[in-house]
UniProtKB/Swiss-Prot annotation:
Species of the source: Parasynechococcus marenigrum (strain WH8102)
Gene: ndhA
Descriptive protein name: NAD(P)H-quinone oxidoreductase subunit 1
Described function: NDH-1 shuttles electrons from an unknown electron donor, via FMN and iron-sulfur (Fe-S) centers, to quinones in the respiratory and/or the photosynthetic chain. The immediate electron acceptor for the enzyme in this species is believed to be plastoquinone. Couples the redox reaction to proton translocation, and thus conserves the redox energy in a proton gradient.
EC number: 7.1.1.-
Main location: membrane
Amino acid sequence: MVSPGLDLELSFSQALQGFGLSEQAARLLWLPLPMLLVLVAAVVGVLVSVWLERKISAAVQQRIGPEYAGALGVLQPLADGLKLLVKEDIIPARADSLLFTLGPVLVVIPVIISWLIIPFGQNLLISNVGVGIFLWIAFSSIQPIGLLMSGYASNNKYSLLGGLRAAAQSISYEIPLALAVLAIVMMSNSLSTVDIVGQQTGAGILSWNIWRQPVGFLIFWICALAECERLPFDLPEAEEELVAGYQTEYAGMKFALFYLAGYINLVLSAVLVSVLYLGGWGFPIPVEWLAGWLNQPIDAPVIQVITGSVGIVMTVLKAYLLVFVAILLRWTTPRVRIDQLLDLGWKFLLPLSLVNLLVTAALKLAFPVAFGG
């Protein structure tokens, strides 16, 4: 038995009704809060990731890194953001101003919206939709349109080449990524991220999907890095070849949106790996033991708060371990060529993901208890 956890909307509504508000008014006040919470979580995740990037890259290169903007340079990401905010926003003379402005928006908004389906605990998520995985795949498929639009609208050969590379790379790696996720969906019999984590809570760490889907885990992680355009897959913005790719003509806030989208996507990918393969909010101590030690029923509010808090900590810790690995890979691996990138996606990862899906289906029929039959 697991703790039912917190229902954010119900708890918020009950709290406001306790102050005399009607149920309809409480629900109306709840409507803007999910996006506000998503924005706060995404921005905090970006700030932490940027700071980690600066410090880890400095350690790899035997430097100190930022140290003057706050203790250990923790305020350096804020300084970077403020600098980009006050820079002049320039639109090239012969660029398509509408598409030039719309491109960064189409890149960043789907990534932010995807956070709505991320569970940090049992019912501790903003939107518990039954097709959360499908929505995430659908939102992620919008991003290549914005990248190609930005490259085309800039009226710059480097930008156009970068946009074409970004679209080709995203399409090449989105298919094996989706097939890797389908194997997880097949085992959990659900498209809900909450159900997928719940399916991994039976035997603690031994029930994590990474043990049953090691190949799928590697496919997902490689494809996620390619979708985030991180080294060794940063072909769309290769400085030595394309200046800055589709971002070449961008400055100020529009450039900041690309910067923001890249890091939000990195943290989102790490959290999704945590949810799909590493047990999400699961932690070693069974809830029953904790409730017995505190002499409380398992559905007591204090148990819900403790398990919810620990669940958030476990999800974030697992995610930032993967962010650390991604940053380390960026500063220690060489860039692949565009032909190698496409060959890896179409000739290796796509067939491998299909074989993995078929093997998962066969194992589910042969061993229904172990593979979610």
